[in-house]
Amino acid sequence: MTSKPINLKLLLESKNMERCPFPIPTGWYFVDYSENLKKEEVRNVNLLDQEWVLYRTESGAVGMTDPYCAHLGAHMGHGGKVCGEHLRCPFHHWEYNTEGWCKAVPYAKRMPPITTLQPIVRTLPVQEKFGLIWCWYHPALEAPSWDLPAIPELTEPGYVPTRRGTWTADTAIQEIAENGVDFAHLKFLHGAPGIPPAEVTFNKHVIHIDMANGYIVGDGYGPGLNVFQFTQEGVTATMISYTQAITREKSQMNMSFTHKVYPEGSKEGAIAKKLVDHMIGGAEGEESAGFESVDFVVWNNKKYRARPLLCDGDGPIIQYREWFKQFYNEAPKLDAA
């Protein structure tokens, strides 16, 4: 046995490490594509570590509400119906608007007084942008503190229809996001020819990354949205990543890929297609492996090391974690009564 001092904590702490020791972070989250939710449809969705009822009213507005009626706790996603602009509970036909206010109790001579003062079921703020349904999550029900950015590639003409992909990982959303600043893993896990140079800046809820001298440039907006442009020979393709926190230990990665319309058979069109293939990891002659084939093996089996042992060649992992902490907010402590 060596006589030198031994850091036993370093050697033994892995036994007590957790896989995903985080709550659900605050932010905007993708729920579904707008085209998938029809008028007057009522559907149950699992997101943000619980079940929700998602529905679209007669006018087209989207509501996302806690499933359980404030009356006697009936699940409004099983037998509930849209009545005009309201979601109607199947049990006694109490009706709620998209903000959680009770608007009708058909057999009540006098509405419960609290129904005139506040919402009585929890709902999430919802936006539809870029053909996607988004919800805002905050554990203490605080209003959105930032808005979704403009993404012209999804709203303006002149771009090819998006290619979409969906992948599920058994890990927390922070672990997936942290990959974006772990530049060394691109060489050693993905097999890239080298560790790319990169610059990272943090500004409030936005992280900006410029990698490989402008080859990959983009921004992350909170925990649930990233927009990156890949540029080669003056041709740019865009990857929009909108990851969902399904539970504390399961995340679903959703991505859209697009580029400008180029003439059929043109050099620019071929470059754009190869850039998109590179993003997915399926480009012909690709030197590095795509994330689907290598990252998931790590994510699905690793534990989170809160005090990592880093070297001078690692990316700004600690700075990233400090920035990400702003998205963790405490839920209110409720009385047991």
Residue map of PLM features:
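A general structural signal for short secondary-structure junctions and capping/turn motifs
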Residues: 20-21, 44, 125-127, 243-245, ...
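Sequence-level motif detector for i,i+2 pairs with an aromatic at +2
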Residues: 25-28, 40, 121, 130, ...
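C-terminal catalytic domain of Rieske-type non-heme iron oxygenases
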Residues: 61, 141-337
